[in-house]
Amino acid sequence: MSDTENTNLTPAPAAEKTLGMRKNGKQWHAPKKAFRPTSGLKSYEKRSQERAIMIQVKAKEKEMKEEKEEERQRKVQAIKEKRAKKEEKERYEKMAEKMHKKRVERLKRKEKRNKLINS
């Protein structure tokens, strides 16, 4: 009797959960596991650090875009000024063909005064 008591007292090895036959008959497929999204795995500190880094990156990108746009606007303005100067020169040359040289000079001075007053 003591032999049977000793066998009953020893704990059985941990019962492994054995998977039986699959109900749908597709035994060649790997068994499915519970869906665990990765969104909950990051800590709050890590997410806040990533947000801070993203804010810095966005600010740097915005600054670079503004610099690029400013450079483009400066080039456009220079081209416009150059064209305006060229048009004005051509206009004075046309006037010089028709009028006396001194009169054209007087008109130039008069127009420059008007530009300064109007602007």
UniProtKB/Swiss-Prot annotation:
- Keyword tRNA processing among record annotations: no
- Report the subcellular localization: Nucleus, Nucleolus
Q: Where is the composition biased (Polar residues)?
A: 1-10
Q: Which residues form a coiled coil?
A: 49-106
**InterPro entries cross-referenced by the UniProt entry:** Cgr1-like (IPR005579)
**Which GO CC terms are listed, alphabetically?**
nucleolus
Ranges for region Disordered = 1-46, 60-119
Keyword terms, alphabetized? Coiled coil, Nucleus, Ribosome biogenesis, rRNA processing
Chain intervals with Basic residues compositional bias: 23-35, 99-119
Q: What does this protein do?
A: Involved in nucleolar integrity and required for processing of the pre-rRNA for the 60S ribosome subunit.
Official protein name in the record:
rRNA-processing protein CGR1
Name the species this protein comes from.
Gibberella zeae (strain ATCC MYA-4620 / CBS 123657 / FGSC 9075 / NRRL 31084 / PH-1) (Wheat head blight fungus)
Task: Recall the taxonomic lineage recorded for the source organism.
Answer: Eukaryota, Fungi, Dikarya, Ascomycota, Pezizomycotina
Gene label: CGR1
